[in-house]
């Protein structure tokens, strides 16, 4: 007679960590029978499921000014709080391109209440961290601090975006800092290639311009340009105050009303419209045979954040995956493209990407190759794309679904990435999508869905290409374009 036994040893401290239902836990024995320990028993697997999904609630409140306050209280002793603003380089024109990024640099250079030194000392004495970044569609200012210092952190953030002095001396000093930053960016070939990719994919549109702006703009941006950008775009309906960690939503709401109130008034008239950005299949080539490796990105037009096909394209992106020589492996790699790349020694590394904006996006792959293998690597990539459109299998899609869910959950580790997730989703969807809903949408993707959606956006579509380095062997654009479909007899 087969016997199954399960032994569970828990310290008293471990028992206390079992949420508050510590008297009941279900375990499966080796023979499949249910084993219980504790005084109370879980009566059904449904009860267990309810416990697993018992994640902190994301609470959202909209103030009269349009400012949205969103938070998740996880009971930690630290927190992250920040302002997510629907304003980035996409809202600029050719003359003021670079203003949003310039403002990010000026944020910590002093306000009407605090000098730059006072601001730095106050943050350091709190043991906090203050940071900011600019993207093509968003500008973000955030602070990481102890939960008890949440009121001071919110007050500092409010002071920064409402009362920055924008002194002429600081502006002149920051020009040099940004120009040096531009030089550093130009040494990062991946960033260079992606800027070129946007420039060719979105020609003569706002998304085609860089975030830092051209050198001539950085040298000429004035205080008036900065003030005009703030008064035009830093308005209540386009700002989210997000927080995560040990935060009380009611306290955060009171702080928002006190420090922002009616100061972030709504727009006079309509909110500035987002300029449309048309995708153009095209290429940029910067040949330099002195460089040791070729850097190449190829992409097709994808969809915006809220489009129904976004999830499916994310799964397809995970299917292609990424690979680096340091990974090792071989034919046992889960990604088919990684198997072919490793077996044929076709490149040093590759990574797939799915970059989404409000109404458009780029879905593609970035690779680093030897000059002699550029053509072969690109051919294998396009062949794998065609396979996604025609013959991807259910087992591959199941693996990609699980990997995507795992990666998304692993990213939500700590108050800062959770706060980032809240702020970004509030701007993109005007709500935070619950994890169970997101998992259900991912699980709904199957091989047939992948084939349909990839055929819609990849098959026989004109790609955008950006290539830098020794790219003599790179096929011409007509040949690359013809490989975006399979011709059958």
From Swiss-Prot:
Location(s), subcellular: Mitochondrion matrix
Alphabetical list of Gene3D superfamilies matching this protein: Metalloenzyme, LuxS/M16 peptidase-like
Protein activity control: Binding to PMPCA is required for catalytic activity.
Organism (species): Homo sapiens
Superkingdom in the source lineage: Eukaryota
Lineage, top ranks: Eukaryota, Metazoa, Chordata, Craniata, Vertebrata
Reactions mediated catalytically: Release of N-terminal transit peptides from precursor proteins imported into the mitochondrion, typically with Arg in position P2
Name of the featured protein: Mitochondrial-processing peptidase subunit beta
Primary enzyme class: hydrolase
Mutation effect (residue 422 to T): In MMDS6; small decrease in protein level; impaired frataxin/FXN processing, leading to the accumulation of an intermediate form, called iFXN
